[in-house]
Amino acid sequence: MSTMRLLTLALLFSCSVARAACDPKIVNIGAVLSTRKHEQMFREAVNQANKRHGSWKIQLNATSVTHKPNAIQMALSVCEDLISSQVYAILVSHPPTPNDHFTPTPVSYTAGFYRIPVLGLTTRMSIYSDKSIHLSFLRTVPPYSHQSSVWFEMMRVYSWNHIILLVSDDHEGRAAQKRLETLLEERESKAEKVLQFDPGTKNVTALLMEAKELEARVIILSASEDDAATVYRAAAMLNMTGSGYVWLVGEREISGNALRYAPDGILGLQLINGKNESAHISDAVGVVAQAVHELLEKENITDPPRGCVGNTNIWKTGPLFKRVLMSSKYADGVTGRVEFNEDGDRKFANYSIMNLQNRKLVQVGIYNGTHVIPNDRKIIWPGGETEKPRGYQMSTRLKIVTIHQEPFVYVKPTLSDGTCKEEFTVNGDPVKKVICTGPNDTSPGSPRHTVPQCCYGFCIDLLIKLARTMNFTYEVHLVADGKFGTQERVNNSNKKEWNGMMGELLSGQADMIVAPLTINNERAQYIEFSKPFKYQGLTILVKKEIPRSTLDSFMQPFQSTLWLLVGLSVHVVAVMLYLLDRFSPFGRFKVNSEEEEEDALTLSSAMWFSWGVLLNSGIGEGAPRSFSARILGMVWAGFAMIIVASYTANLAAFLVLDRPEERITGINDPRLRNPSDKFIYATVKQSSVDIYFRRQVELSTMYRHMEKHNYESAAEAIQAVRDNKLHAFIWDSAVLEFEASQKCDLVTTGELFFRSGFGIGMRKDSPWKQNVSLSILKSHENGFMEDLDKTWVRYQECDSRSNAPATLTFENMAGVFMLVAGGIVAGIFLIFIEIAYKRHKDARRKQMQLAFAAVNVWRKNLQDRKSGRAEPDPKKKATFRAITSTLASSFKRRRSSKDTSTGGGRGALQNQKDTVLPRRAIEREEGQLQLCSRHRES
């Protein structure tokens, strides 16, 4: 006991010595409250905070005033009663008068000027979130615009994708619109229509009539009480509060005068403890107390200003204290967890979801700060319905956009009477055509006039089928700019917008795209695709290289070197056969001794044998006789068989099964991967193919080359290939294969790449997307898509490439006929040479015979004279005279021919040793004839 007394005395002594060190720091907290009762609650909350924190270093002190009737008095009261007391923060509630919305404003302006934090208790106007106006304002309640988060969550829970946003054109309405649109963008969606009206307007009928024409049946309303009442009255007159409609509103729209006219079934929101000023006082004091203790632990803390004295009295620590307050997390609040966002607004607020039933508000769910938890069994929807409305009406008149792309969509002009010409398909069925409006010319720079035209093809048949199945009508128009759709910058800014069919769909000019629109990720981020109605990929179109048959086509199976070797082999083998048979002792033989020996194999016969074996023409005579030569003959026959068989096989490959050589092998062809100006290839500008090449890093080199040569449309590019202005065109395989089957000078080459499909495009919130996909799947199952494919895509006018033998034409075999003609000409030429040679040889033989006959007669006469006969026989003398006369005249003709042929020099006979007798022989014969003549005369 004595020890305790000593400690107490020591403590009292130390405090008396250093009193300042023992006294707690007084922290004043100001408040502007609605009533004296709330001032008492404020003081009690401060005392509770002192007890809760239990720190002897800090003592919170409450300083409060009530609301003043006008803004000037309120500002003066803040300066004289609160700031003069060096308050660290000021709490302010909403004034009790409903129409006085701006009472917190003078408090916020005055305290904010000196950087003193202000905590709003029940103020929910969105203007206080603007920190350029209210620098130091925080609040323990969320603004009205935060109700958009609850609406957005309810849309997600009930799968409502079609909404109409009806807002007043004031700060509150614009804030709600901005927040909801931001949330919808994160979900890649948007409101079907945003309708604004001026605050205080008394007539919104025209606006609601516009809303009634839309598909959406979920209406979100943000307006004041009086404006909401005006909207409710007009909606009831237009029958927009009955079955099928959904009304989502906030707290103001089901309060006061608005509740009197609100339709049964409406769903509204009420902030839990939103008007419980005492609860918010307790939570605000707790947040400030927690922040003060955290602030005073820091260094260089200055005291708040003492009074409103110019701009030199700004609290330097005020911004720091505000940041400490905004980062506070007060978990044990009466109204729940208290936290602030970057604008100083309350986060994680809890709402009650209220349903108006029989003119009474019934709670049918809650929002716990992150999720909506509804009680669907308790909800009564407009019109007394108990089933959740689907939130949209199915429009029976759809705007269809398409594009000219054969064979999917053909476009032809109408007849003079505005109708379409009757045509028939390959199956004999009439072609189904629809009237479509669109520009008569989509080429760049040309004047465009929207005119009615006739559309038909694969996609039109599909559209007619879908309309019949899903019970809707349609109006078709061609895309204005002739493009499928890609994103492009607007006025060289960073903002991008879609053009083509994509742009028309997203802007609301069309409800559906029925065209060969390629499904890709970039487009799927903005629109909804149906299941593919046609699977395909990308391929390459080139001009077909038609082979030109030359006269030497029959020689193509062998190279020139091989032909030379075969020809050389024929003659070498012939010479070897001749030599072997010549030198063999068995080259000539006879069957028995009585027969004469057979002739040996001559060089001519050997040559004939060699060629005959090679050409399989049969050997009638001149076969080798010796065993060695016959061995060579058999080997040569085997060689000839192999050569002929190889030639025949290759000849069939070159002439019968010949196909045009494809110019490129596919996307990995070196001419594509390593582009040059000698080989130009391209695709269509701003198409899915263009996007594909632009997005692929490994194809960047190809894209840079293609970008300079891309065409406006596929039809232009295909014609450029046919005109040899473009070497290769990369496009959808379904289109290019059809073009190749219709235009026989074109061919597709290479394997498919970038496999994808064609789908029907709809907006993200389209009510038709599920039904369209189901209808397409059923069409695949029942064979309808296969029938369309056969009718429009796979129909071929050109012969398809196959492995069946092709028919030979004269061009293929012209060289063979020329070879025969050459043989005939050579034979005729040689026969004349043979005739001339034969005549020359016969004349020479006759001359020799006459000469020998004359010599024989002379010898006979000489022998007779020697034997004693005086006179020769007169007949013999006459014969001898005739022979010598003929022989002499013959020699004279030869000599004169020789003289005329030798002109001024040596004659041709001197250069031809085998055509005339030697000069000496002629002179010797002439001498003998002269001797015979003299002897006869003697």
UniProtKB/Swiss-Prot annotation:
Post-translational modification remark: NMDA is probably regulated by C-terminal phosphorylation of an isoform of GRIN1 by PKC. Dephosphorylated on Ser-897 probably by protein phosphatase 2A (PPP2CB). Its phosphorylated state is influenced by the formation of the NMDAR-PPP2CB complex and the NMDAR channel activity.
GO cellular component, one term: synaptic cleft
Effect of substituting residue 642 to T: In NDHMSD; uncertain significance; changed glutamate-gated calcium ion channel activity; mutant channels are activated at 2-fold higher glutamate and glycine concentrations
Keywords linked to the UniProt accession: Calcium, Cell membrane, Disease variant, Disulfide bond, Epilepsy, Glycoprotein, Intellectual disability, Ion channel, Ion transport, Ligand-gated ion channel, Magnesium, Membrane, Metal-binding, Phosphoprotein, Postsynaptic cell membrane, Receptor, Signal, Synapse, Transmembrane, Transmembrane helix, Transport, Zinc
Variant or mutagenesis effect after changing residue 647 to S: In NDHMSD; likely pathogenic; decreased ion transmembrane transport; reduced localization to cell membrane; changed glutamate-gated calcium ion channel activity; mutant channels are activated at 50-fold lower glutamate concentrations and 28-fold lower glycine concentrations
Function (record text): Component of N-methyl-D-aspartate (NMDA) receptors (NMDARs) that function as heterotetrameric, ligand-gated cation channels with high calcium permeability and voltage-dependent block by Mg(2+). NMDARs participate in synaptic plasticity for learning and memory formation by contributing to the long-term potentiation (LTP). Channel activation requires binding of the neurotransmitter L-glutamate to the GluN2 subunit, glycine or D-serine binding to the GluN1 subunit, plus membrane depolarization to eliminate channel inhibition by Mg(2+).
Name the record gives this protein: Glutamate receptor ionotropic, NMDA 1
Disease tied to this protein: Neurodevelopmental disorder with or without hyperkinetic movements and seizures, autosomal dominant: An autosomal dominant neurodevelopmental disorder characterized by severe intellectual disability and developmental delay, absent speech, muscular hypotonia, dyskinesia, and hyperkinetic movements. Cortical blindness, cerebral atrophy, and seizures are present in some patients. Neurodevelopmental disorder with or without hyperkinetic movements and seizures, autosomal recessive: An autosomal recessive neurodevelopmental disorder characterized by severe intellectual disability and psychomotor developmental delay, involuntary and stereotypic movements, spasticity, and inability to walk without support. Intractable seizures manifest in some patients.
Organism name: Homo sapiens (Human)
